[in-house]
Amino acid sequence: MASSTPSSSATSSNAGADPNTTNLRPTTYDTWCGVAHGCTRKLGLKICGFLQRTNSLEEKSRLVSAFKERQSSKNLLSCENSDRDARFRRTETDFSNLFARDLLPAKNGEEQTVQFLLEVVDILLNYVRKTFDRSTKVLDFHHPHQLLEGMEGFNLELSDHPESLEQILVDCRDTLKYGVRTGHPRFFNQLSTGLDIIGLAGEWLTSTANTNMFTYEIAPVFVLMEQITLKKMREIVGWSSKDGDGIFSPGGAISNMYSIMAARYKYFPEVKTKGMAAVPKLVLFTSEQSHYSIKKAGAALGFGTDNVILIKCNERGKIIPADFEAKILEAKQKGYVPFYVNATAGTTVYGAFDPIQEIADICEKYNLWLHVDAAWGGGLLMSRKHRHKLNGIERANSVTWNPHKMMGVLLQCSAILVKEKGILQGCNQMCAGYLFQPDKQYDVSYDTGDKAIQCGRHVDIFKFWLMWKAKGTVGFENQINKCLELAEYLYAKIKNREEFEMVFNGEPEHTNVCFWYIPQSLRGVPDSPQRREKLHKVAPKIKALMMESGTTMVGYQPQGDKANFFRMVISNPAATQSDIDFLIEEIERLGQDL
């Protein structure tokens, strides 16, 4: 992991200065005049007047003359600021008589396009503002039939004839209105939460560029950003900076699928051309509490879900290494060929971290590919305080890491990292002649598209790269540490209260805090099938009331023979202790009469 020590190159004279203001402080009258020129005439003259109080008569005269000359200029194109202000000034526009055909690239469509997009930006900014306003609901819940039947002014049905831009703007507002504010500080329902403003800016730019990630020739900057970022992520995992490979995929499930494909190709490259009939009876392993995507990949890739063997876990949801080794031996005795195991760093429900070191020892003993699904827990690698929970990850052959989860990058942003260079290319390359010509004028090794199972690939890198530039590694570290501190705060608040019961003993490893709310009617009642049956209904009822009121959202689920319990997860940097307190109080309020 890169050192977070601040650079010592700053001069001693600036040691106590705020770098954010020092670098922005204009040092010449021409610069100040430019600042004044970007303001209204009244404010600009005030800036000039302020400077005149401390400067010579000659300098005063030159500054004011320059300002007045620029203000009186009739040529708007003489200054970028003036040009911008003139072109992007809001005007009264009747959108009821305008249609998509009136926007660019229509002839004379620039003004209509500007006004339409300014309205859209207003809608977005209003949504962003409300997202961070705790007095605003997390959601305005409606049942599916209500939305399908249509709300006032909002109809999901598609029409044969174009609708006005006025209606399109209404549709934009209502789409956000009836959705869920996943960036709200009191949204705790999923592993992916938050609304990072830098990431939002990056996503706007990405959509505007509207390009594809398969070749350098159409996405030169984005392709290089992806390579640089993946290299940095591999280094943080603990691999050599010279080796390795990776690619961004549509999500953790696809990244996990890539890992199985890469492992199969590594051991049995003939499968690419001859199919599964040409290889032995293969089996792979994963924990009984791992993400369901491993079994889904087993079905999709032709192994069959019966050949995805589940390893037992302890009470905290971690793989039991002895059971893993026993199941390898059992499979071999039955004539199967074990080749792959998935260890999880941050399980979906308990937030458990499998013992990677012990699993890696077994993999080396039996020559298995070790994959670590760190989709949820990978962000902890950025934290010097918590990365020890992933000790041994550097021994993995591949790693899934989802920045759109713990790191707060906007959806979607998932990486598959592979220790050995060339396997992804060999596994997936099809050499489509219309895309991947070998005789281009640049180094075609930068045409990364043939490593992917997709052809078209969305640009997921820019928002992540931009956030990393804005926060730095230290910024991500602080963000992740804060979320884990909030989980510890929640655990400490409820662990000894009679109205709450923890699903397992001990502090959480991740931000997952699993608990039951015990209504008054069940407190002090001994454990029995009847009590568990009643308790099983509590979390769904509270969740339904929670969604109806729209005040907060938190997930629930059963696990094994356990009754439904709440699974609290914290990945939103906007959340605070007061939001945790609110959640506890809201659960008590909604569940007190059950």
From Swiss-Prot:
The keyword Lyase applies. The modification N6-(pyridoxal phosphate)lysine is found at K405. SUPFAM superfamilies: PLP-dependent transferases. Keywords: Decarboxylase, Disease variant, Epilepsy, Intellectual disability, Lyase, Neurotransmitter biosynthesis, Phosphoprotein, Pyridoxal phosphate. Its EC number is 4.1.1.15. GO terms for biological process: chemical synaptic transmission; gamma-aminobutyrate shunt; gamma-aminobutyric acid biosynthetic process; glutamate catabolic process; locomotory exploration behavior; social behavior. The modification Phosphoserine is found at S78. Pfam families: Pyridoxal_deC. It comes from the Eukaryota. InterPro entries: PyrdxlP-dep_de-COase, PyrdxlP-dep_Trfase, PyrdxlP-dep_Trfase_major, Pyridoxal-P_BS. The keyword Lyase applies. PROSITE patterns: DDC_GAD_HDC_YDC. It catalyses: L-glutamate + H(+) = 4-aminobutanoate + CO2. Residues 1-13 have a biased composition (Low complexity). Its cofactor is pyridoxal 5'-phosphate. Transmembrane segments: none annotated. One of its GO terms (cellular component) is perinuclear region of cytoplasm. It is linked to Developmental and epileptic encephalopathy 89: A form of epileptic encephalopathy, a heterogeneous group of early-onset epilepsies characterized by refractory seizures, neurodevelopmental impairment, and poor prognosis. Development is normal prior to seizure onset, after which cognitive and motor delays become apparent. Catalyzes the synthesis of the inhibitory neurotransmitter gamma-aminobutyric acid (GABA) with pyridoxal 5'-phosphate as cofactor. Belongs to the group II decarboxylase family. This is Glutamate decarboxylase 1. The gene is GAD1.
